[in-house]
UniProtKB/Swiss-Prot annotation:
The lineage of its organism: Eukaryota, Viridiplantae, Streptophyta, Embryophyta, Tracheophyta. This is NAD(P)H-quinone oxidoreductase subunit K, chloroplastic. It is found in: Plastid, Chloroplast thylakoid membrane. Keywords: 4Fe-4S, Chloroplast, Iron, Iron-sulfur, Membrane, Metal-binding, NAD, NADP, Plastid, Plastoquinone, Quinone, Thylakoid, Translocase, Transport. One of its GO terms (molecular function) is iron ion binding. [4Fe-4S] cluster binds at C43, C44, C108, C139. Its cofactor is [4Fe-4S] cluster.
Length: 227
């Protein structure tokens, strides 16, 4: 397993004083104490529960599971996310302090999995709701893969600049808790690739903040969510 590299922490003076920046020091302290909020809804979460045992021992990474989003800086979604779960997941994410990170674990979380073709109540990808930092495919992923995903997230944090992260999040649009999911009628015309199309009301009747958390500088032709 590769170790986390710090580009500025190896510059030592003759007096054995580490020369670094406050940003690198903050990143080092955060990656050594990631406190996850476990959002498990199906079988993928059982694989993550295996990490608690002595065989994998995820405590060595500083991972301390928290039950409150206000004490967590990492949310790990494992399993299917339904339409009814979506507002609560977004609410939990908004209650987490900055900086915060997301790991999407399993095919059902990333794309909807086996429910992505003809299910009327499944969200086809958790990245439609909250920004995802690391995608972990599998059905379900092995505990070794979860450790590898956490290692990659630690490497990402070690090279991160907070201002760049905030700027990149503002480019994308994510739903807030004020957004209401409406179930559309299914369209069965014989093709398995036909999904469910949701068209919100006209934007002239509702303010823009009802739909999106961040405003994008690029114009969008329409506001449609395909699940």
């Amino acid at each position: 397993m590769n170790s986390v590299e710090f580009p500025l922490l190896d510059r030592r003076t003759k007096n054995s004083v580490i020369s670094t920046t406050s940003n690198d020091l903050s990143n080092w302290s955060r990656l050594s104490s990631l406190w996850p909020l476990l959002y498990g809804t199906s079988c993928c979460f059982i694989e993550f529960a295996s990490l608690i045992g002595s065989r994998f021992d995820f405590d060595r990474y500083g991972l301390v599971p928290r039950s409150s989003p206000r004490q967590a800086d990492l949310v790990l979604t494992a399993g299917t996310v339904t339409m009814k779960m979506a507002p609560s997941l977004v609410r939990l994410y908004e209650q987490m302090p900055e900086p915060k990170y997301v790991i999407a674990m399993g095919a059902c979380t990333i794309t909807g999995g086996m429910f992505s073709t003809d299910s009327y109540s499944t969200v086809r990808g958790v990245d439609k709701l909250i920004p995802v930092d690391v995608y972990l495919p599998g059905c379900p992923p092995k505990p070794e893969a979860v450790i590898d995903a956490i290692t990659k997230l630690r490497k990402k944090i070690s090279r991160e600049i907070y201002e760049d992260r905030v700027r990149s999040q503002r480019v994308n649009r994510y739903f807030t808790t004020n957004h209401k999911f409406l179930i559309g009628r299914s369209i069965h015309i014989g093709n398995s690739d036909k999904g469910f199309l949701y068209q919100p009301p006209a934007t002239s009747k509702l303010p823009a903040e009802k739909f999106f958390k961040y405003k994008s500088s690029a114009p969008s032709p329409s506001h449609e969510l395909v699940n």
